[in-house]
């Protein structure tokens, strides 16, 4: 949900102004919960291979944007450059890991029936998930939480740390561009 009210944010370590991000109030949050609930069935019925491919596209996009994302981590979270590079790489690894693991774990399994019937075990998403991430790994942990929930068929309401929301917003933009529905 896009919120009109925006204020500049100060980085946790010093008075560096970082990009503005939308702020949400209780009504915005309630609206987002309702939208995530409505979107769940459609996303859950998206084949796991397609959801995994979406995460891989996001990983590729994140790799292409690595310098820009590192610069934002340096500015917003006061990471050193090498730590920022490591964090972006870890976020990329999370996207690829969960994509690969979901295809393996969520593949339908044929189970033998005691009387010869055909049984298939299918894992399904559970609904709308809330992911709350910390400020100290604002891209890697945020991305890992969101990726795991999305690839298993769940919709996500993500609440980044208030000290580092701009990098999380960039991750969300990359996920949407890769094919995760915005609504």
Residue ranges and their predicted role:
Residues 1, 19-22, 26, 48, ...:
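Hydrophobic alpha-helical scaffolding
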Residues 74, 102-183:
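Rossmann-like NAD(P) dinucleotide-binding subdomain of oxidoreductase/dehydrogenase enzymes
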Residues 57, 61, 90-98, 174:
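Alpha-helical scaffold segments in carbohydrate-active enzymes
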Residues 31, 49-57, 64, 68, ...:
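Generic recognition of stable, solvent-exposed alpha-helical segments in well-folded globular domains
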Residues 51, 95, 149:
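Hydrophobic, well-ordered secondary-structure elements that form the walls
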Residues 64, 97-101, 135:
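Glycine-rich, acidic and aromatic/proline-enriched surface loops and short helix-turn segments
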Residues 81-106:
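Amphipathic alpha-helical
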Residues 1-75:
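Short, structured beta/alpha segment
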């Amino acid at each position: 949900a896009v919120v009109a009210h925006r204020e500049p944010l100060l980085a946790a370590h010093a008075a560096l102004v970082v990009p503005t991000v939308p702020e949400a109030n209780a009504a915005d949050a309630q609206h987002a919960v309702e939208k995530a609930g409505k979107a769940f069935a459609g996303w859950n019925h998206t084949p796991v291979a397609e959801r995994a491919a979406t995460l891989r596209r996001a990983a590729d996009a994140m790799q292409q944007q690595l310098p820009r994302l590192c610069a934002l981590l340096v500015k917003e979270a006061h990471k050193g450059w090498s730590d920022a590079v490591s964090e972006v790489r870890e976020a990329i690894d999370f996207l690829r890991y969960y994509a690969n693991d979901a295809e393996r774990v969520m593949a339908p399994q044929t189970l033998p029936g005691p009387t010869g019937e055909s049984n298939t075990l299918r894992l399904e998403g559970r609904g709308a998930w809330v992911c709350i991430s910390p400020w100290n790994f604002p891209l890697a942990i945020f991305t890992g939480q969101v990726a795991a929930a999305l690839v298993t068929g769940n919709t996500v309401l993500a609440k980044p740390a208030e000290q580092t929301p701009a990098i999380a917003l960039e991750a969300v933009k990359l996920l949407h561009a890769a094919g995760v529905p915005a609504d």
